[in-house]
Regions:
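N-terminal acidic leader/helix
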Residues: 2-28, 59
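Short, mixed-charge low-complexity intrinsically disordered segments
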Residues: 35-66
Length: 66
């Protein structure tokens, strides 16, 4: 199943970034697949994961992608 994982700043929800990943369930994403999504976003944007965290992208949410 495909899921959209969105990362955003918890306080302001400013400029969210998202990607679509394959996973069996949301539980699988919560257990660590979100890290793969974060790497995918970083590669797409040319960031390092540590830079992404410093910019404030510390919260993520997941929803089913159609």
């Amino acid at each position: 199943m495909k899921y959209q994982v969105t990362f955003f700043d918890k306080e302001t929800k400013y400029k969210p970034v998202a990607c679509i990943i394959e996973a069996e369930s949301r539980t699988e994403i919560a257990k660590g697949k979100w890290k793969d999504a974060m790497k995918k976003v970083c590669i797409k944007r040319g960031w390092k994961p540590s830079e992404m965290v410093k910019m404030g992208y510390t919260t993520w949410k997941c929803r089913r992608a159609e």
